[in-house]
């Protein structure tokens, strides 16, 4: 019995030794700084889940400007992606280059087994997307796409109501996205130079903001591909955007539902909201947190506030880290998934084709 106190002293040490050690932060490289959404990762509060180990950006002046703004060392900056990957050996790369450049990022990362998260949309066209998909599958990497609206609690509340059958079968989705225009809101020229060029972005507002609606409607419809696409684009401000559209409406037809995507650089204010109508009820996501719901037994809309998303489902880089570390399962039906975003690119390419020809385009595309 004299040894009992000593044994009791050892118990906490034994229990501590059995506990798994905390996982180290995921080593992340940043491919490009020319997409203004890069401030999301550069200005992110420290959460201990990722560590930026390198940045690939040939524009030294831009890198220095952002280094001063966010306080990172220029020692992290490399002139190109290949040199950054070789020197820093990241586990994952976040692509904030041009949309056209997403393929190049995957071509460099996939053979090295490096996971990739691109900023929306996945690819500039279906040809690029299919090459990226093939590389991701061949080398068994994650290929994720980030959208701001993925992290809106309001959108997830609407989806829950739809999935629970509270609204009845979905009949119509109306999704509004955009702002006054990238030049009007003061986007830097390193961003607008490629954003307003069809080669590097694939189009104008139809791509920049049409992708949100394509992503959300595919998610709400549980991965179902539309049967046809009809789109109309306009150049309301050709003096500002001579190469691309600044106004787009895309109609997605499903066997028993319809989605109307209103993508614009002409809204009088910035907006990312949607209306979902079921057979017997409706739910509107007004912004990131607010929504209003009309249930079958009600004659009016009831305002609601969505609960905040819990980690790691509240942040793109937390999600990326959790998937790389395999602390959460991969969901092929999610907003970030490759499966969803292959359909998104197909919708966008069909929309561009429809707008150019004035004809309805049927899916799947060849």
Regions found by a protein language model. Name each.
Residues 131-149, 171:
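Rossmann-fold dehydrogenase core element
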Residues 184, 272-343, 361:
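C-terminal glycine/acidic-rich active-site capping loop/insertion
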Residues 10-17:
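Hydrophobic h-region of N-terminal signal peptides that target proteins for export
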Residues 17-71:
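N-terminal Rossmann-like dinucleotide-binding module
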Residues 62, 72-135:
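Beta-loop-alpha module in the N-terminal Rossmann-like domain of NAD(P)-dependent dehydrogenases
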Residues 213-292, 318-328, 350-351, 364:
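Contiguous beta-strand/loop segments that form the cofactor/metal-binding neighborhood of enzyme cores
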Residues 36, 150-240, 358:
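Predominantly a Rossmann-like dinucleotide-binding segment in NAD(P)-dependent oxidoreductases
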Residues 19-22, 92-94, 322-366:
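C-terminal helix-rich "cap/oligomerization" subdomain common to oxidoreductases
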